[in-house]
């Protein structure tokens, strides 16, 4: 079954559904499908339609770290789900401060609109004021994004790219990635993938 492991990881209901479908239709173990269990063909549209997340539901943003730590960036409302794997999540800021790396003022009532796409090595968050003013854009480089019914998950790869309201683009936190490689937390090939992804984003912004 295409996406076998990825679907089962979504929820207990999804896991049970996969077991049932494979018991009826056969699986790779039965030799009935050459690509059964291949998560490269994960059927995002069908899976989210059946198990979520759905528009109007809340999901957490689970920000993993290579050292094993996990940080929640809060919960947001799913405002759009596209069968091609794209997911829009909107959050409201509840405190004043400064946007990390962007440097602009953060005000309570600001809105963060994040676009995730299943399997992509980065995601983008645009910050806007309650009046619609642009506060800036933050692009996080990470391991391939996975959208589950209750959370969007990935592992942060340190290096990121920001775009400020005046159009200035800056790549940030290369030093943190270098340190993670030196500490053995991130392999050299993975680090190179992160750097090349950041370079492509920097050019595109």
Predicted regions and their residues:
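Acidic, polar-rich N-terminal leader regions of halophilic archaeal proteins
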Residues: 1-205
């Amino acid at each position: 079954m295409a996406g076998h492991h990825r679907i089962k990881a979504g929820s207990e209901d999804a896991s049970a559904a996969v077991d049932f479908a494979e018991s009826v239709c056969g699986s790779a173990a039965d030799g009935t499908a050459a690509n059964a269990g291949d998560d490269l063909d994960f059927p995002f549209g069908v899976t989210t339609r059946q198990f979520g997340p759905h528009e109007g539901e809340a999901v957490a943003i689970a920000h993993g770290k290579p050292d094993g730590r996990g940080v929640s960036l809060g919960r947001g409302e799913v405002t759009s789900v596209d069968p091609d794997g794209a997911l829009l999540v909107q959050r409201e800021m509840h405190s004043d401060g400064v946007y990390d790396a962007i440097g602009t003022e953060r005000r309570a009532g600001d809105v963060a609109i994040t676009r995730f796409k299943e399997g992509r090595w980065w995601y983008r968050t645009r910050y806007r004021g309650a009046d619609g003013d642009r506060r800036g854009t933050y692009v996080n480089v990470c391991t391939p994004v996975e959208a589950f019914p209750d959370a969007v998950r990935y592992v942060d790869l340190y290096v990121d790219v920001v775009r400020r309201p005046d159009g200035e683009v800056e790549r940030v936190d290369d030093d943190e990635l270098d340190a993670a490689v030196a500490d053995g937390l991130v392999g050299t090939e993975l680090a190179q993938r992160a750097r090349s992804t950041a370079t492509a984003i920097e050019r595109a912004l």
